[in-house]
Amino acid sequence: MSAAILGQVWTRKLLPIPWRLCVPGRCVSSNFKAADLQVQVTREPQKKPAPSQPLLFGKTFTDHMLMVEWNSKTGWGPPRIQPFQNLTLHPACSGLHYSLQLFEGLKAYKGRDKQVRLFRPWLNMDRMLRSARRLCLPDFDKQELLECIRQLIEVDKDWVPDGNGTSLYVRPVLIGNEPSLGVGMVTQALLFVILCPVGSYFPGDSMTPVSLLADPSFVRAWIGGVGDCKLGGNYGPTVAVQQEAQKKGCEQVLWLYGPDHQLTEVGTMNIFVYWTHEDGELELATPPLDGIILPGVVRQSLLDLARTWGEFRVAERKVTMKELKRALEEGRVREVFGSGTACQVCPVHQILYEGKQLHIPTMENGPELILRFQKELKAIQYGTSAHDWMLRV
């Protein structure tokens, strides 16, 4: 696909990104160009995983990575694709000390036609720029970064697995690289992208539901915070709570918020409730994007699909544990599930809340909606159903 055509596609897909804290001039920047991309191919390619070898998430990496450096005096340097290697960072690096760091996660899929396609990458570019502006890290041109990522995948296209449920996970990262212990806007930054082949979240297409610990004493995000940005600092503090959940026999954490115990997220996933609302109407509900919720790409995709079907009400609104408990007691809950790039759609069958186990009848109900979502997403992602959500590599 020519650069001109890609530019037309991206101009249509990419959205303007406002951010009230980063007024013009606060984040000195230039735009790196994909046309200036330098490519250094490795002389020591790694052995690729065998088709029968399990692909554990984040354990195997491809031969190359993308690197772009920035400083406040000259702006962005030329982007380069280089052999995968360790980073050299100053011990006072601000990204290490003060979590001036953000990341993204998206996937490329190889279809039966052997074509590699990225799933809705424009949404990831939008979110990544929003996160960068929240940390006052340098702006970048979303279109140019996406083209650099596309070319990186093209270089390592033989690493894209083609087994059932497999994909190539793409991890862009932007860190402040200030060699100083002061807290403030950085004068140096580093953007890099690494790739890793991953297997299916549910091996063998089995669908294992998860149990959740819902403890209001733990809070993931709050109004006025950064819960709607994909920052490394949002994830580290969840590890201890995840361990607490496992001690109590639960696989994941249901994050609650406020005195009314609003449902917000499941682990690192968005949450959905498919039920008959108390007004008698069949509804798919998910928390609104009010600054607490990460605007997930799969979340948006499920909402878009459901609204296209037009078979039930789709609501972005607050759902409380009181509402959920009452609906369970009245037999109105059909399915509860999480959504995210790693799992796509993950069923929930149990919630431990206030010392009591609440059974969720997700699996007893098919789960019809989850299976329908998964089938539709897979058809789009692997190219069996043509869709403008996919960007061909």
UniProtKB/Swiss-Prot annotation:
Top-rank EC class of the record's enzyme: transferase
Subcellular location: Mitochondrion
Pfam families documented for this protein: Aminotran_4
InterPro entries noted in UniProt: Aminotrans_IV, Aminotrans_IV_CS, Aminotransferase-like, B_amino_transII, BCAT-like_C, BCAT-like_N, BCAT_family
Stored PROSITE patterns: AA_TRANSFER_CLASS_4
Gene3D superfamilies named among the record's database cross-references: 3.30.470.10, D-amino Acid Aminotransferase, subunit A, domain 2
Catalytic reaction(s) noted: L-leucine + 2-oxoglutarate = 4-methyl-2-oxopentanoate + L-glutamate; L-isoleucine + 2-oxoglutarate = (S)-3-methyl-2-oxopentanoate + L-glutamate; L-valine + 2-oxoglutarate = 3-methyl-2-oxobutanoate + L-glutamate
Binding site for substrate: 169
Record carries keyword Acetylation: yes
Expressing tissues: Expressed in all tissues.
Cofactor section: pyridoxal 5'-phosphate
Broad class of where this protein is predominantly found: mitochondrion
Residues the record lists as N6-(pyridoxal phosphate)lysine modifications: 230
Transit peptide region: 1-27
E.C. number(s) listed in UniProt: 2.6.1.42
GO cellular component terms attached to this protein's record: mitochondrion
GO molecular function: branched-chain-amino-acid transaminase activity; L-isoleucine-2-oxoglutarate transaminase activity; L-leucine-2-oxoglutarate transaminase activity; L-valine-2-oxoglutarate transaminase activity
Family membership noted in the UniProt record: Belongs to the class-IV pyridoxal-phosphate-dependent aminotransferase family.
Its job: Catalyzes the first reaction in the catabolism of the essential branched chain amino acids leucine, isoleucine, and valine. May also function as a transporter of branched chain alpha-keto acids.
Protein name, per record: Branched-chain-amino-acid aminotransferase, mitochondrial
Lineage of producing organism: Eukaryota, Metazoa, Chordata, Craniata, Vertebrata
